[in-house]
Amino acid sequence: MVLANKLDRNLRAAEESSDGEDYYEVTDRSSSASVIEADEGGNVISSDDDMSDASDHDDDKIKAQMSKVSFGALAKAQDALSSKQSVDRKRKRGDDTSKSQEDKLEALRERLRQIKAEKLANGTQPSKKAKKSKTKTKTTQDDNVEEKEDSDSDAAPHARSSKHAPAVQSSKRMVSRKRNVVEVKKPVFRDPRFDNVSGPRPEDYVVEKRYSFLKDYRASEIAELRNTIKKTKNEGEKEQLKKKLLSMESQQKARENKERLQDVTREHKKKEKELVKEGKKPFFLKKSEQKKIALVDRFQNMKAKQRDKVIERRRKKVTAKERKNMPDERRTA
């Protein structure tokens, strides 16, 4: 008789839920202790021989069980194993590469921030090479957004694109924090003498006649200024007083020219009114004609020496103007 009529050994197929792989596991439910039995003659059969026979018998059973498994099931199990191994490898590689790329990008961003801070402290603009390096480091869209936010936060407000570009000023205006709950009319100070409410505005020559005493006051002021210039010994003060005297004299001349033009227009209006009464059409003088008549009147009222001085001064002024408009080649020749 064999060591055991029945060895409690079975083949059990177990399917893993993680990868869908079919495999078979051999489980031994018998006790590990060896059993010694005697044959019909009373001879003791060795346990080693029995174990070898049992193992051969088990191998035969396993082969018979495996022969019943279809090739399709084996192919599916092999594909599942290979796909799982490839996914695991990709995950490991992806984790390593993503971590290394993130570390490199973070180091580059930190370096760029340091360069920006140094350049802003020195008051210089970033160079074109730095801008090119920035564009190279922008690999993904997320990195672009982060770098734009960093540049906006680090950049100075209203910074120029280059030193030759015009200064940029924002068109936005800050809203005032003060709020007028009750609107009050702003007080307006007015002079009734020059306001239309008190009547029509008088003509200029009428105003000048009313305030004619100002002419005498200005003339006396100019005379006093000339005396002070003669008495002062300090050169700096003398130069300032001379400038003041020159401006006052030029203002007086401008007033005289204006009065002369007003006189010309007044006389012309009187003549035209008389002609209109006779039935003729009115004729209005141009500005240029008014200036010509005023200039003729001015030269007629001058003395001979004064007239020569004015003509010589005017000639020099005209020649200087012509020389200024002349080309450089003719001017130096």
From Swiss-Prot:
Residues 92-122, 219-281 form a coiled coil. Residues 1-15, 54-63, 93-119, 252-275, 319-333 have a biased composition (Basic and acidic residues). Belongs to the RRP36 family. Component of the 90S pre-ribosome involved in the maturation of rRNAs. Required for early cleavages of the pre-RNAs in the 40S ribosomal subunit maturation pathway. One of its GO terms (cellular component) is 90S preribosome. Associates with 90S and pre-40S pre-ribosomal particles. Residues 128-137 have a biased composition (Basic residues). The keyword tRNA processing does not apply. Signal peptide: none annotated. Its main location: nucleus. InterPro entries: RRP36. It is found in: Nucleus, Nucleolus. GO terms for biological process: maturation of SSU-rRNA from tricistronic rRNA transcript (SSU-rRNA, 5.8S rRNA, LSU-rRNA). The gene is RRP36. It holds the Pfam family RRP36. Residues 16-25, 143-153 have a biased composition (Acidic residues). It comes from the Eukaryota. This is rRNA biogenesis protein RRP36.
